[in-house]
């Protein structure tokens, strides 16, 4: 899937996720040569250097949560997993974003995996001492284990398949749900038509900025 593509990985990304990238034909490179930037922690020093770079400030670089790789590895329809849903914003913006849309999609799936792991561990304990009546069933179960495994993985990725129809995951709106605009389009010019545009740097509280702007405009 990533044949010939180059990816940079933050130190917060596990070796398992990096291996998925390589198994799909991707190559590991430095930041400047990379086509994709992956991280699992917006506060990690490696990722902070990206956020503070000129490329990121000028919108020439985007950081993605590396759980995207796990998502495509656990689904048969790899192209159905939207990369845009895994954009990893700076830590200073995440609290504000969660307040507006809820948990990020990778947080939802991580929680699902933990619950799935707990259920499987509990089931294993119950099956340590099978009753005589279940011995034949266990034999058949072992025989069909490989057949059932893909079904489990497919269910694990259900939130991704139903997304963005199921907007309870992150609150993003599907493009299909947007109304079509039939009027004339005009270029947006900051400072005109009653709208202003601001560039926010470093870890500034978004709510404080909004309040300051309201006082300035009132």
Curated annotation (Swiss-Prot):
PANTHER family from the UniProt entry: TELOMERE REPEATS-BINDING BOUQUET FORMATION PROTEIN 2
GO cellular component, one term: nuclear envelope
Free-text tissue specificity from the UniProt record: Specifically expressed in germline tissues.
UniProt family annotation: Belongs to the TERB2 family.
Phenotype reported upon loss of the gene: Mice develop normally, exhibit no overt phenotype, but are infertile (both males and females). Gonads are characterized by the absence of post-meiotic cells.
Keyword Transferase: no
Organism: Mus musculus
Localization per Swiss-Prot or TrEMBL: Chromosome, Telomere; Nucleus inner membrane
The protein, known as: Telomere repeats-binding bouquet formation protein 2
Classification lineage: Eukaryota, Metazoa, Chordata, Craniata, Vertebrata
Keyword Lyase found: no
Span list, region Disordered: 117-143
Keywords: Chromosome, Meiosis, Membrane, Nucleus, Telomere
InterPro entries with a match to the protein in the record: TERB2
Known partners and oligomeric status: Component of the MAJIN-TERB1-TERB2 complex, composed of MAJIN, TERB1 and TERB2.
Its job: Meiosis-specific telomere-associated protein involved in meiotic telomere attachment to the nucleus inner membrane, a crucial step for homologous pairing and synapsis. Component of the MAJIN-TERB1-TERB2 complex, which promotes telomere cap exchange by mediating attachment of telomeric DNA to the inner nuclear membrane and replacement of the protective cap of telomeric chromosomes: in early meiosis, the MAJIN-TERB1-TERB2 complex associates with telomeric DNA and the shelterin/telosome complex.
Superkingdom, taxonomy of origin: Eukaryota
